[in-house]
């Protein structure tokens, strides 16, 4: 029984108010992330097709309107230096920069900067104003441009309006309509805290999240060697990447470089891309720290209703323009902050730097023995000394970063090219394959991080060919469960977060996937060898230029085996192609390897995450609903698809047949379960009356009888009339997973992305 969670404050006594289940049982398995971004929250009907709407957009007119906005300063939020470029670059960067490679979550693909918690992060102070400046343009073009696309395109246009040649831009990011609860942003409960993500981190502040000038006075013990918790890519709760004052506010550029390298690396950036992004972004605009943070009001989610979504009201002076407080730092990097120059590197290496304080009390650096020549953002008669952030100096004082920075100083063309490419990658890393990309500015050069696929340059197989290939596959003598396991292993790498993985490309035959333990490499090699022979024979005999890819044959093998096991027809859509090893970034794909995969009874939980939580996490990446999760696990078990061929969860007397036996036997009240491994991971089911052993199962199996919501679903499939529905639903869910990465089949359908 849970302990009383009442905190003696009165909650709203209306629908949705009061003590919730999570208050009573905070460790309860939650399925909420499997119910997000559905039609219930989407104001558009299913008929709305964002890709079609985007194609009807007057793209050039939109870009002109955005360009005009850059210098159309508004009295309610005036533009620094008469140009909003720096603000909009930051908006785009902070939208896309939440991406992390470990699970593909974050990024700009959902337009989540509009929602909590991102809209109220300390690092996003004043971006509420940036989005409001954009509203008249969004209002004008309506559904033809999503917020997700508009925020990133605006950053691109900002760069172009200040003389920078960008690498290109692709649209195609449908909006979502609610806060995404799937991303783990950290376990801290105060802004700027990091005590949960680092072994010796610090608690944050209870205020509004502006940089504290006193932060660096804390005791810091591990800033030169600490390890950031996975999957996080930010050093503090509420920051996009690192503390600009230095680790935990400590103004140490070398230690800051370590944090930079880790966090940018977890956003899929290497050292050159990291240096280019920091220096390129800091070529423009300024930071804002006109006065201490105690002048700043509540963030948007905590602000009063009359603020209408604005936050961080500022009582210092006018509260805007020269009196703006954003980060608490007050730095203008270059003499020409509204133009593309190489001045960031010129000043970085020209001057020696000494530590100083911003008007808000934050640590920053000022050039020694320099004359004031940096322009003021609002007073043409006022000049400033050159200033830098601790994290800027990291690009000079870290040996690896310094080498790149000096090269960029001497070769401005290399700097411009590196920044253009890194910026494009930042904005598009979670876009998925090019079949999702829209617009007239898609670059012709194909980049390795796109996980490129060869084009489909031949006629695809027809129904007669499909039937013949299925017969050939079954004639190989491969056990059906091996064919099903291989097809599932190939397709289930897909991540709806960043649209990576999936069966298309047949990358399961390439490094690193071919060697993953979860894929049972010995069995995989056997199956792939036989399927490659089938593919080769067909392609040698086919006429009219017709071919079949191994990617298609792998999926077709699973389909053939499933049809044999279920006695029903299973859909199949050809058209996949085969990627090469040269088109596959091994290091990047290593992040797709599962730590635990409950669908195949692989791996288990730890002292932080339970096995069943990993299962739900994986189901979310596969864009599954709770019923789809249940029916797939139940079906894969009776089909014998455990990664190692074990009997765990195979609750049937007729393995290999697609029956609802998993649910029937799991729900049998005559079975008594006990833990047998001493770790709470493996269990044995015995007949209550005789004590005879009947089954073994894992947490990923027993959760469907233990968890009240999953049990409710299991009871549907385990009922006397559940078999027909079970088979129908399993086949539908199977087909969905096999085609998760086939954006070429129905490009852009629906207003919401596959999440």
Swiss-Prot record:
| Subcellular location field | Cytoplasm
EC number(s): the record gives: 1.11.1.21
Tryptophyl-tyrosyl-methioninium (Trp-Tyr) (with M-267), cross-linked positions: 93-241
- Active-site feature positions: 94
PTM comment text: Formation of the three residue Trp-Tyr-Met cross-link is important for the catalase, but not the peroxidase activity of the enzyme.
Required co-factors: heme b
* GO biological processes: cellular response to hydrogen peroxide; hydrogen peroxide catabolic process
Cellular component GO terms held in the UniProt record: cytosol
Instruction: Site (Transition state stabilizer): give the residues.
Output: 90
Question: What EC class does the entry list?
Answer: oxidoreductase
List of residues binding heme b: 282
| Cross-link (Tryptophyl-tyrosyl-methioninium (Tyr-Met) (with W-93)), chain numbering | 241-267
The organism's superkingdom is given as: Eukaryota
Query: What Gene Ontology molecular function terms does this protein carry?
Result: catalase activity; heme binding; metal ion binding
Q: Which UniProt keywords are listed?
A: Cytoplasm, Heme, Hydrogen peroxide, Iron, Metal-binding, Oxidoreductase, Peroxidase
InterPro entries xref list: Catalase_peroxidase, Haem_peroxidase, Haem_peroxidase_sf, Peroxidases_AS, Peroxidases_heam-ligand_BS
Quote the record's cofactor note: Binds 1 heme b (iron(II)-protoporphyrin IX) group per monomer.
Which catalysed reactions does the entry list for this protein? H2O2 + AH2 = A + 2 H2O; 2 H2O2 = O2 + 2 H2O
User: How is the quaternary structure described?
Assistant: Homodimer or homotetramer.
- Entry's HAMAP family? Catal_peroxid
Q: Could you tell me what this protein does?
A: Bifunctional enzyme with both catalase and broad-spectrum peroxidase activity.
Q: Which family does it belong to?
A: Belongs to the peroxidase family. Peroxidase/catalase subfamily.
**Name of this protein:** Catalase-peroxidase
This protein's species is Podospora anserina (strain S / ATCC MYA-4624 / DSM 980 / FGSC 10383) (Pleurage anserina)
């Amino acid at each position: 029984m849970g302990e009383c969670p009442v905190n003696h404050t009165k909650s709203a006594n209306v629908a949705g108010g009061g003590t919730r289940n999570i208050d009573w049982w905070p460790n309860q398995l939650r399925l909420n992330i499997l119910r997000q971004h559905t039609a219930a929250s989407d104001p558009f009907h299913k008929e709305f097709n964002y890709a079609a709407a985007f194609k009807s957009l007057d793209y050039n007119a939109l870009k002109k309107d955005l360009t005009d906005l850059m210098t159309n300063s508004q009295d309610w939020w005036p533009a620094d230096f008469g140009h909003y470029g720096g603000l909009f670059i930051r908006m785009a960067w902070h939208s896309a920069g939440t991406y992390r490679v470990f699970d593909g979550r974050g990024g700009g693909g959902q337009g989540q900067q509009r929602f909590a918690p991102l809209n109220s992060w300390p690092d996003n102070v004043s971006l509420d104003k940036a989005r409001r400046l954009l509203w008249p343009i969004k209002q004008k073009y309506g559904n033809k441009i999503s917020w997700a696309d508009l925020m990133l395109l605006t950053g691109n246009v900002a760069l172009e309006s200040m003389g920078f040649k960008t690498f290109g831009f692709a649209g195609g990011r449908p909006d979502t309509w609610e806060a995404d609860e799937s991303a783990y942003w950290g376990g801290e409960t105060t802004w700027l805290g990091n005590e949960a993500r680092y072994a010796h981190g610090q608690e944050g502040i209870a205020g509004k999240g502006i940089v504290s000038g006193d932060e660096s006075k804390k005791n810091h013990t591990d800033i030169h060697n600490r390890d950031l918790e996975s999957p996080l890519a930010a050093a503090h709760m509420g920051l996009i990447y690192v503390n600009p004052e230095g680790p935990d506010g400590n103004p140490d550029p070398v230690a800051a470089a370590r944090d930079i390298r880790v966090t940018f690396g977890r956003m899929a950036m290497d050292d050159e891309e990291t240096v280019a992004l920091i220096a390129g972004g800091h070529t423009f605009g300024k930071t804002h720290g006109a006065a201490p943070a105690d002048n700043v009001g509540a963030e948007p989610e905590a602000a009063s209703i009359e603020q209408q979504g604005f936050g961080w009201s500022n009582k210092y002076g006018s509260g805007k323009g020269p009196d703006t407080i954003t980060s608490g730092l007050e730095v203008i990097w270059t003499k020409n902050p509204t133009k593309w120059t190489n001045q960031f590197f010129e000043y970085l290496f020209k001057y020696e730097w000494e530590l100083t304080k911003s008007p808000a009390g934050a640590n920053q650096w000022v050039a020694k023995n320099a004359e004031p020549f940096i322009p003021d953002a609002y007073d043409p008669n006022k000049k400033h000394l050159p200033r830098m952030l601790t994290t800027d100096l990291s690009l000079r004082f870290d040996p690896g970063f310094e080498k790149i920075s000096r090269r960029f100083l001497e070769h401005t063309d290399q700097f411009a090219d590196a920044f253009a490419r890194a910026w494009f990658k930042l904005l598009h890393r979670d876009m998925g394959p090019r079949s999702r990309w829209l617009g007239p500015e898609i670059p012709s050069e194909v980049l390795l991080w796109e996980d490129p696929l060869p084009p489909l340059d031949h006629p695809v197989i027809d129904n007669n060919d499909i039937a013949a290939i299925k017969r050939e596959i079954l004639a190989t003598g491969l056990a059906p469960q091996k064919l099903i396991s291989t097809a599932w292993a190939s397709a289930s790498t897909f991540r709806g977060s960043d649209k990576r993985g999936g069966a298309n490309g047949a990358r399961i035959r390439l490094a690193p996937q071919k060697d993953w333990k979860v894929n049972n490499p010995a069995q995989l090699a056997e199956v792939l060898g036989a399927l490659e022979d089938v593919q080769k024979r067909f392609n040698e005999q086919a006429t009219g230029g017709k071919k079949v890819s191994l990617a298609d044959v792998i999926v077709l093998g699973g389909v053939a085996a499933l049809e044999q096991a279920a006695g029903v027809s299973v859909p199949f859509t050809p058209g996949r192609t085969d990627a090469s090893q040269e088109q596959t970034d091994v290091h990047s794909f290593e992040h797709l390897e599962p730590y635990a995969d409950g669908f195949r009874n692989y791996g288990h939980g730890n002292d932080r995450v339970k096995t069943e939580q990993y299962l739900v996490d994986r189901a979310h990446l596969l864009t599954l609903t709770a019923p789809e999760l249940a029916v797939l696990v139940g079906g894969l078990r009776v089909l014998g698809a455990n990664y190692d061929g074990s009997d765990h969860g195979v609750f049937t007397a007729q393995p290999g047949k697609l029956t609802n036996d998993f649910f029937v036997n799991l729900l049998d009240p005559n079975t008594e379960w006990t833990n047998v491994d001493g770790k709470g991971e493996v269990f044995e089911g015995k007949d209550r009356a005789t004590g005879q052993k009947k089954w073994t199962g894992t947490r990923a199996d027993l959760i469907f009888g233990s968890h009240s919501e999953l049990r409710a679903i299991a009871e549907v499939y385990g009922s006397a009339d559940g078999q027909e529905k079970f088979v129908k639903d399993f086949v539908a869910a199977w087909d969905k997973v096999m085609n998760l990465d086939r954006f070429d089949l129905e490009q852009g359908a629906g207003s919401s992305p596959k999440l």
